[in-house]
Amino acid sequence: MSVQDTKAVEFSMGHIRSSSVSLVAEATSNTNSEDKLSKVQLYEDLCRYEDTLSKLVESVDRFKPNLDIAKDLIRTDEALFENVKLLAEYDNIYRNLQKIDKDSEELDSKTRKILEILNECHDELKALPMLEQVEFEKNTILQQRSKINSTELLDYATKLSKFTKIPPTFDKGAVGPNNFIWPAEDALRRGMLAMASLHSKELTRIPGEEVEETEVPTVPPSQSEEQKGQMAKKEGTPKTDSFIFDGTAKEVGDEADNTKDKEKEENNDDALDLDLDLFDPDDF
């Protein structure tokens, strides 16, 4: 082998080592990714283009270029150029795949929630009594009701009616006039109807109507002083001898007014005595 041949072999081996670190070589290192990418036509054309190019470079390094390899490289390049146009379609497929994955995750979460709710409903349903038990309890209640005779109910009702005699063990002091539902006579006299009858004019007065007031004749102060002087001269008592009323006289006057008011109220109570005797002891 000549010196040129040895140099060409060394150069070709160096080129092979440099090409081993290419993108395709790194992708082939992973078996899983290789299985997925091998199904793509673009990946196959790219691998074929790289292999053909490496063969052509090797033949050129040996100073023996092969035309068949060059033609094959041209055909591979044309096919690769045609398949590059499919990258947009692959991009759309990838986006649709991401959307489908997102929808799948949402459906999984919804399904998980539905299963949890169904599990809770199952536990609640399991805690409820069975239909047979409910029907059994219903039948027992109906049987107990059917055992009660109507004559017994009527006999018990006659014991409670007011036409029967009071049992000997009955406490007469338990029920009195204070326990009846209707009001007593005193409460009726002090009720709203009795108070309304006293103030009928105020209650029946039309709103906005002025209250009629008795007119009091007004006397000028000069005339009132002259009249007082004349009365003093007739009585023969000087003005200096007039009595000075203090608080004691006022208290006596207030007590007299209070006694008069009480007498009026008693007279009004006597006038309102309508003989409303609603309690009849003979009925019991």
Swiss-Prot record:
This is Mediator of RNA polymerase II transcription subunit 4. The modification N-acetylserine is found at S2. The modification Phosphothreonine is found at T237. Residues 266-284 have a biased composition (Acidic residues). Its main location: nucleus. Keywords: Acetylation, Activator, Nucleus, Phosphoprotein, Transcription, Transcription regulation. GO terms for biological process: cellular response to heat; positive regulation of transcription elongation by RNA polymerase II; positive regulation of transcription initiation by RNA polymerase II; regulation of transcription by RNA polymerase II; RNA polymerase II preinitiation complex assembly; transcription by RNA polymerase II. It is found in: Nucleus.
